[in-house]
Amino acid sequence: MGGAAVLDWMVQDGVRLENCRHDHPLAVLGPQPDDQGWTVRVWMPEAQKVTLLLGSQEIVTSTPNHPWIFEASTPSDPGSNYKLRVERGGITTEQHDPWAFRHEWMGEMDRHLFAEGNHHHIWQRMGAHLTQIDGISGVMFCLWAPNALTASVLGDLNSWDGRHHPMQKRLGGIWELFVPGLDAGTLYKYEIRSQEGHCYQKADPYGFQHEVRPDNSSVVARLEGYSWSDSSWMQDRDSRNALDQPISVYEMHIGSWIHASADEPWIQPDGQPRAPVPAADMKPGARLLTYAELSDRLIPYVKERGFTHIELMPITEHPFDGSWGYQVTGWYAPTSRYGTPDEFRAFVDRCHAEGIGVIIDWVPGHFPKDAHGLAFFDGTHLYEHGDPRIGEHKEWGTLIFNYSRNEVRNFLVANLVFWFEQFHIDGIRVDAVASMLYRDYLRPDGEWLPNENGGRENTEAVRFLQQANHVLFQHYPGALSIAEESTTWPMVTQPTDMGGLGFNLKWNMGWMHDMLDYFELDPWFRQFHQNNITFSIWYTYTENFMLALSHDEVVHGKSHLLHKMPGDDWQKYANTRALLAYMWTHPGKKTIFMGMEFGQRAEWNVWGDLEWDLLNYEPHKGIQRLVDDLNVLYKAQPALWRDDFDQFGFQWIDCNDNRHSVISFMRRDSASGTWLVVVANFTPQSHANYRVGVPLEGFYEEIFNTDAAKYGGSNLGNMGGKPTDACGIHGYEHSLDLCLPPLSLVVFQHDPKRTLIESSAPSD
């Protein structure tokens, strides 16, 4: 190529670089071989002078082709270890040349697996990575934007001017750039220019940290370096059946559990105060707690209550507090509202040290339309379906992932592995699964597209959920994967190789609705609705169910649990205690939302915090004691959890006494052969001499009674237990003559060590 042609070519390249329209800067910039040896070309917008520092040499560059392309000749390949002295705006700096590093970060196998949708650790390639190339430290930026005309990195490193750092386009729609000299804490975004020339500034989809709202830039963060101390917990978790244990979950929203004063900032380990993150305006002067403060306050509280797990409503980064976290923009980052990624790791580590598992809500069903997020990412519908009839939740104002695209599924499946690997979480609850499974979910006729078979099922989402659960249990066999699925979709908790969705637990939404409908009734009318309280047993073994009284039931005018109950305050408290006790003795794992454990009165409001002052009142303290003791009883009695998903674990004694609204049943443990007798009276009328059949004669100790005085009850009961009578009823030859307190549930345990003679002898 002649000199004039080269000159013309370089002028065109300079114009393309200046206008952010060059997708292959490494073809022009950095060390380039030529007839005389090597030419180093440097792209340095608005610089007045650039000097090439090569060993002891200082070579002044020239700008023969474009005022921002600085060139210098060398007889041999300078490699990547040279530096540049840059004079710009009266300031002189020295730096390495980003375009001296030609290393391809995303390898051929990485691209192949990603294109297949099977790169389970794709975050180790995508995003912003602190690394070294040729001994030089910096950050490798890697982005997937296959339809973009160009992509650039902008941020603190270049005064937010996308012209400075154009990225190199690789195969498979990957863009890369190594920027030497950057460190953790650098703010950045990607500037993406569409084929039509429109410019979009996007946060990193694989960003590992983001700014505190309302700002939304990504932040360079270290993935490695935290020193975990939970190895024994992790080994034990993955060596056992995840369901063969008591599971009692405290569901909570970190930002509205309790607030602190903005006048009392958290003091960091370096002795400096952390800038407070304001809470919402319901409490002027309030700030959010940090992950570190939650470690000191929340974990001891949950441990004292006896819960086995904490479930965190979404802690992935999200811009709007009012979404409760369910409109995610930062999938690979814990929200910065409460601190740094390492501080969240320390929170999980501390939970494990105290014997508490951590479950997070995971939201792969939709994402928001925020301009800095995934929507219309590279000027096309990259992550979402283009047709709103399948790509948009109009009622929620959000977009739906295109599960048919391999790279999109890979983004989500790898995200699941990421949270377990990077943050040692123990489980997920997948939100709004029904919205994923049905194409006509919340859509009128004419506003949804049928599947390839003409049906309403979203077969793409089904395959995605199956893949996600298969991969999760392949990597973490002891994990919990919980579906919030509100329909009768079959085999939700069956393994994927049997055609199921692959979850190992499903929220029992039918039980929840039936229970709340029943307990909201005036007790006199409950006799006509006995089916509400008993129906769940007829289907409870069709799935692995978790009983949940969640946040969804205490918002939007539904009232909190206590205020759903009829009657005066005494009856409200008693009904609440009876419902919670029935929940704990019914087959299935347990979840309740924060505030229910002490009888919160007001609806949950994300802008406020819980009514902790209620614990100054004995009835609320009594409900808290009840929940504490329910968890103690639950964990101490394998009959209440070991056979949750086996019909052996439950046996009705009598479910037909609707006239008295009384039920009785046994919970049984196949391993030890032990059992418990549970009797519940769901009216305010107490019953003396109420007879219940039992399988063996002997003494039955009363081990739990919701009407105990310490819980706020009337303290009616059975004097510690009752011996059997040889009076047959309910198909048994022996029975107990019981006192049933009002609005109560009582639990008895057969004591084979106490004879009938001992139990009937007068006490001293």
From Swiss-Prot:
Has keyword Protease? no
State the EC number(s): 2.4.1.18
Keywords, A to Z? Carbohydrate metabolism, Glycogen biosynthesis, Glycogen metabolism, Glycosyltransferase, Transferase
Spell out the SUPFAM superfamilies in the cross-references. Answer: (Trans)glycosidases, E set domains, Glycosyl hydrolase domain
Q: Which InterPro entries match?
A: A-amylase/branching_C, Branching_enzy, GlgB, GlgB_N, GlgB_N_E_set_prok, Glyco_hydro_13_cat_dom, Glyco_hydro_13_N, Glyco_hydro_b
- Give, as one word, the top-level EC class: transferase
Q: Name one GO biological process term.
A: glycogen biosynthetic process
Q: Which Pfam families match?
A: Alpha-amylase, Alpha-amylase_C, CBM_48, GlgB_N
> Cellular component GO terms, alphabetically?
cytosol
Q: Does the keyword Glycosyltransferase apply?
A: yes
Q: Which Gene3D superfamilies match?
A: Glycosidases (3.20.20.80), Golgi alpha-mannosidase II (2.60.40.1180), Immunoglobulins (2.60.40.10)
Catalyzed reactions: Transfers a segment of a (1->4)-alpha-D-glucan chain to a primary hydroxy group in a similar glucan chain
Active site per UniProt: D431 (nucleophile), E484 (proton donor)
Which pathway is recorded for this entry?
Answer: Glycan biosynthesis; glycogen biosynthesis
Spell out the molecular function terms from Gene Ontology: 1,4-alpha-glucan branching enzyme activity; cation binding; hydrolase activity, hydrolyzing O-glycosyl compounds
Protein function: Catalyzes the formation of the alpha-1,6-glucosidic linkages in glycogen by scission of a 1,4-alpha-linked oligosaccharide from growing alpha-1,4-glucan chains and the subsequent attachment of the oligosaccharide to the alpha-1,6 position.
Q: Which family does it belong to?
A: Belongs to the glycosyl hydrolase 13 family. GlgB subfamily.
Q: How does it assemble?
A: Monomer.
- Entries under HAMAP family matching the protein: GlgB (MF_00685)
Q: What is this protein called?
A: 1,4-alpha-glucan branching enzyme GlgB
Species for this entry: Synechococcus sp. (strain CC9902)
